[in-house]
From Swiss-Prot:
Species in which this protein is naturally found: Streptomyces hygroscopicus
UniProt protein name: Phosphoenolpyruvate phosphomutase
GO biological process, one term: antibiotic biosynthetic process
EC number: 5.4.2.9
One GO MF term attached to the UniProt entry: phosphoenolpyruvate mutase activity
Pathway info: Secondary metabolite biosynthesis; bialaphos biosynthesis
Catalytic activity: phosphoenolpyruvate + H(+) = 3-phosphonopyruvate
High-level lineage: Bacteria, Bacillati, Actinomycetota, Actinomycetes, Kitasatosporales
Amino acid sequence: MNATEQAANGDRGTTRSAGGRLRYLLHAPGACQLMGVHDGLSARIAVAEGFEALWASGLCMSTARGVRDSDEASWTELLTLVGTMTDAVPGVPVLVDGDTGYGNFNTARRFAGRAERVGAAGVCFEDKVFPKMNSFFGDGHQLAPVAEFCGKIRACKDAQRDPDFVVVARTEALISKLPMEEALDRAAAYAEAGADALFIHSRMNTPQQIATFMERWEGSTPVLIAPTTYHTPSVDDFAALGIAGCIWANHSMRAAFAAMRDVCQRIRTDRGIYGIEDQVAPLKEIFGLFDYEGLEKDENCYTQAPDLAAVQG
């Protein structure tokens, strides 16, 4: 029984791979939640707080690398960060933001293959041309031809090793201010090309575009959203529309950004740290999250001096 069949039968049993677990969540009743992360620390925190799946955000990883979200970081740099996430939270599904696939079908399938090898559950590619710009900045978002993008999807599906590895197709038609019909047509074409899920993106300040899309969508392929700008509804509200998953794409990084800026300002202004200790995480919380006590126990176990008398008989 594959992960899709497990979800249909209400079976929450473990699956063979991270891809299988993500596939299960996308087909289970309701809308799953994927927390945006950018490194091993943010992944550990998200899982410790109960998230079952993660989104390796291109914006957040690029920002963590100190560059813009416009394909300035190489895909090998980003997948190195993804590896820190899968190492930090083994078995937890990580869906990787693969931007446009960094070129043609060949670079897209190479990206997907490398993501699979570092333990990711799946990849998401968007239908903009390379190089891209972040969807929330500016208006010059040119889309790739439908046939070209479908070729990327097919190439990735043909090359994957794990049958449960998830390939998500993201359309930027609404971001590019194209008609709803264009978004629906592209979604249908991408599903036909083999996409395991669709990501419908909007930057309106209400969910109306998403609601309209779901009312008119006749396919069975799961639909994901990232409600970054239309943030009033809850995950349950989106589930009622038929959404399969909500990606909280960049909130962890933005929270860290604000906290780091504020503490830097405070220390510089106060010329000391006497006023901030109650505003930062205690070191014991960090030691606890990373199981320092476990390492100490292992040291006692594995570095004890041998009993020479016993060894010599």
